[in-house]
Amino acid sequence: MSTVSSPAPDGARVSVRKCEHWAHGACCAEIFDKEHDGKQYCVLHYPGPEKSKDFKTALERKLSAQDFDFEGTWFPEKLSFQEFKFTGKANFSSARFREVVNFREAEFSAGADFREAKFSTGADFREAKFSADADFREAKFSAGANFAGAQFGSATYFAMAHFDANANFRGTQFRAATSFFGTSFRADAVFNYAQFEAPATFNVARFSKSALFTGAVFNATVYFRKARFKDEDPHRNDDITADNNTIDSKTLRPEGRTIPVDFVEARFKDGLAFTGTKFANRVFMSFASASFEKPERAVFHSTSLRPHWFADIDPRAFSFINVAWGDLLQWGAVRKEIEQLKTTKKSNANQLLEITFRQLAVNAEENNRFEEATNFRYMAMDVKRLQRRRIDPFRLSWWYWLLSGYGERVPRAFLALLSILVLFALAYWVGDAAWWQPKQSRDLASATTSEQKFVSQRLALRESLVYSAGVMALQKPEPLPANKRAKTLVLWETILGPVQAALLALAIRRKFMR
């Protein structure tokens, strides 16, 4: 502690000591108050509620002197700066607010510094105006933080800040570059109808609950590189990462409360970037009715996505690089996508998803991701099938799906062709000798009589397989069918075999012609 002289009320000189534990500027001319844990503090920095009366006097004295340096100050009780005008730079860095603090409609004309400030109970900055830089780096909000309707006219920094309760930025205006780099949102983060006039970064930010950007306007690029949308519970491991080439059934069956990442009706006038972003299994991201003036600047790089997240928008011009869509070949994947979308859209979910799959297929096709395009086309047609009865043998499209996966599934078409061959071969094998005409020798040199008698025989299993293959190849293998049953089987295989072979050829052609 340093010592200065100050006049006492009776004119005598008394010893006044300045607090050196915190910044000198904030406690200049403040007398020594008390000791705490062996350290000496002035009335501003003493960390105890019993100083309230003296603190109020010191606070009023600083404000009346237009002294807004409160670096490291410990505020013991509720405080209101509502509609207060800070004509000079307001320095609240490292300050501690024990009770609710109210900055509603306050005006910060020369900058606001809240670096490493701690708000223990609640912070109200509704409709506050920041004309110069606003710095909340590493600030900690233990209770609700309300910035609804606030206006940030210059650079704004919330980098590495911690919001342990709801963070409300509804309708907030960010007119210059804004940084939420590494910011932690452990409760709902609400940016509904916020306006970002300059680039905004949420790189490495962590969203544990809802991230809502409904109706937000982005006039410049917004970045979400390596952001995490997941519950930070250390006992939960529910990431979907771009390193995963497949997503198991548990991934597509969320447990617990869904984590919404909501860009509904948002407007992106420049770009959007999700790079290396991690999403929890329970995340549901929606861009429904969002508008992109430069859709080619919407970039999703090395991250994991779900097709139903892009329902009700047009993603054909988006840039998808090294994106993991999950196992689109998994049985029931389409049905799970429909169920996920129906959790938020009760009506026309099937129609929206069908359109989305077709648009994603176009995007993949135009960017030479042909295997991915094949999967999306298949899923688009399968959505329409699932709207009807599951088994519908009277509809041609149902057979098209069953026998070749709409001409997109080579293994299925091959398996169907093989099944036709084997099933007809088994039918020929179980048939008795009366099914077949006797073989007649045409080797005239070997004939010793003018008439020779032959006996019909059943086909062995190997002979049946060869016979079935010959019929399928439109040959006329011997023995020829002798009764109606055998002739009917041969006729049906003559039709079905070549048709299925054509479906297989079509699927192969679609796979390689691109």
Where are these regions (language model features)?
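N-terminal leader/targeting and pre-domain segments
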Residues: 1-396
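Pore-loop/selectivity-filter region of tetrameric P-loop cation channels
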Residues: 398-410, 433-499, 503
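Alpha-helical transmembrane segments and their helix-start/interface "positive-inside/aromatic belt" motifs
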Residues: 408-418
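C-terminal substrate/ligand-recognition segments
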Residues: 416, 420, 491-507, 512
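Membrane-water interface at transmembrane helix exits
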Residues: 424, 428, 432, 436, ...
